[in-house]
Amino acid sequence: MKFSENWLRSHVPIQATRDELAATLTAIGLEVEEVTPLGESLGQVVVARIVEAVRHPEADRLQVCSVDAGQGELLQIVCGAPNARAGLVAPLALVGAKIGELTITAAKLRGVASNGMLCSAKELGLDSDASGLFELPDDAPVGQALAEYLGLPDASIEIKLTPNRADCFSVRGIAFDVAAACASEVVAFDAGMVAPVSTRTLAVELDAGKDAPRYCGRVIEGIDPSAKTPVWLAERLRRSGVRPVSLLVDITQYVMLELGQPMHAFDLDTLQGPIGVRHSRVGEQLVLLDGRQVTLDESFLTITDAGRPVALAGLMGGLDTRVTDTTRNVFLESAYFAPEAIMGRGRKLGLHTDAGHRFERGVDPALPPQAIEVATRLVLELAGGTPGPVVHAQLPEHLPQPARIRLRRARIARVLGIQIDDADVVRMLRALGMHVEAVAEGWEVMAPSRRFDIAIEEDLIEELARIHGYDRVPTTLPGGASRIAMPSETQLDELSVRRQLVARELQETINYAFVDAALLERWQLTEGLVPLANPLSAELAIMRLRLLPGLVATLGRNAARQAGRVRLFELGKVFAAAADAGAAPGESQHVAAAVCGDALALQWGEPARKVDFHDLKGDLMALAAASGAQLEFQPSTQPFGHPGRSADIYRNGVCIGWIGQVHPRLAKALDIDVDVIAFELQLMPLVQRALPRAGELSRFPSVRRDLAFLVPDEVSWAAVSASVRTTVGPLLREVQLFDRYVGQGVEPGFKSLAMGLILQDNSRTLTDRDVDAVVTDVVAVIEREHRARIRS
């Protein structure tokens, strides 16, 4: 938001200097980005009129001008501006004037004397326009100091507004904050009512419900099309970053900047019937003021005339109904459109307008009737005309209502940590335009209709802190004894998990906790999803159900950039919808890893090979060993896993995760052209561990017996090893699978599993009879329980 310092001071009388004003604005949250002083060195610049302009005898692009500067005699000025002409009124810098770093002196240009310089707005530091001389109105008083005529010195102040402060997109809105911060009061503003002189009206119909609940319109006939924008109004616009265009357009811009209410002016003679406000229809077209033809859909609000669209509500008017230099009859529009109805619509069409910027953040719903009276008064004062009555159409049930909030003095002290005097609380809130009534425990406060951001008690406390001054809130360090939690011996902490995985040459990655719904569909993870109410984007609209979709996508991006060996892991939370509709989503901590490419870094001592299931399983078993977890693996039917190369992971009979190769079809859909091996587990079941217990070391030798069985394909090693452990009992130190074979010599439907049994007793040396008895029992159990037979 850019505005004139003098304009602001006309609404709030303060004694603060310009620097103090800028500091105050920043301190109360209206961050000042730039202050541009205007007209501070124009002491010898006056209003002058060119009486005669002839071509320079030695230069085609120069003119020799005779200029009346109000000194009794004409001054000869050589000028190269393309718009220099007889009768033009423009600023003249007299000899001795200092313009920026340039001091004006009498000089000769191509042999012709020049006693001063006719100036452009840019040369005077008033605007960026350097296309020609700064043209002043024909009735500007010749000889008057330019600074006095233009109301200088002044400054153009630009502030940066946060999205919640839509009320400060106007000079008057800023004035309320300044008044509160400087213990002043905003100058009373009464728009008054302009009495109608004619009965001419246009009917207005509201057919957009809550999106357009208020619309004011007024006909003004017989205005003077030759009327020009007065210099005071044009300068206020220019110093606010708006270039003057024509009187009617400038008046609507002026009202928007002063009050915050965007307006539009239609040429009445181009309108054919009653005004309507409705949602556009698919395929409707409209030529906008900038000459572009746009095709609309049902998401846009349109202003219609006898059914045809004539303007995009809240964004831009139409070309066919615009006001021109010949307009004599005008229809003024002042309306309230809901922010949700305007938000994002301009971006769909590539439009960015001041009106749209304000409407999508929220305009005071009570302002349209006042704004149309102010605009009417300006039109009548500057261009004449006959006003008709204001047509006021509204849907009261859809108009936002000001919030009524109970503010407790005890709550102020609790939130801010300081006591603010009751009188100061009332003064600050009333200066901000709020209605305040005292009650037993504090105050009953009603926020003004322009303050959409005031809804709860904490909003009022924030306003008090902002105006009172954050720098006046003393710094108080929190007290109390700090208690450092002792690490638990019964579980492995996350840092240890990270270190274990890093030691296995895995690199940690941190992905968004939000994923694309389409990505989860590819993984066939569609149940229990938790959608976000306000996603960052459409691609990040679902809370992740697993770590693997995001982790594998990251791995794919790395693999696509010539990374030959990618080894990633992630620790993070996953989310699932609760079974009860009203309950909060559940969340749990998971750990996942994904690898692809070479199994080992390039070296001369080992032949190159690709990473496989058993490599990553070894990494997982090393992690499990750190917590003492005994993991079991069962064939998995997860749809995202390779059907023959994936397994569900169990601990103590409970499934806690998955490991395997990502299904080739899924990898192809993700544009990954290498095999991806991955695992994901619930973290807490993995890291739980029993307190270490010292066991007796046997002084007696161990005995090893190797057995090979033919077992059906569907029988897993986990089931076989479990039977062995149950059968042998405490004599079994370890059972190792050292060979798995399928092929010649093994009948179809079976596989050969070769295992080693390591037996040991703590009290004696095992005899051959002891060992043979154990082996006999193992063979019998495996043959009986798993339909296996000993391989000869």
UniProtKB/Swiss-Prot annotation:
Signal peptide: none annotated. InterPro entries: aa-tRNA-synth_II/BPL/LPL, B3/B4_tRNA-bd, DNA-bd_dom_put_sf, Fdx_antiC-bd, Fdx_antiC-bd_sf, NA-bd_OB-fold, Phe-tRNA-ligase_IIc_bsu, Phe-tRNA-ligase_IIc_bsu_bact. Residues 39-147 form the tRNA-binding domain. Binds 2 magnesium ions per tetramer. Residues 400-475 form the B5 domain. GO terms for cellular component: phenylalanine-tRNA ligase complex. It is found in: Cytoplasm. Keywords: Aminoacyl-tRNA synthetase, ATP-binding, Cytoplasm, Ligase, Magnesium, Metal-binding, Nucleotide-binding, Protein biosynthesis, RNA-binding, tRNA-binding. It catalyses: tRNA(Phe) + L-phenylalanine + ATP = L-phenylalanyl-tRNA(Phe) + AMP + diphosphate + H(+). Residues 698-791 form the FDX-ACB domain. One of its GO terms (molecular function) is magnesium ion binding. Tetramer of two alpha and two beta subunits. PANTHER family: PHENYLALANINE--TRNA LIGASE BETA SUBUNIT, PHENYLALANYL-TRNA SYNTHETASE BETA CHAIN AND LEUCINE-RICH REPEAT-CONTAINING PROTEIN 47. This is Phenylalanine--tRNA ligase beta subunit. The gene is pheT.
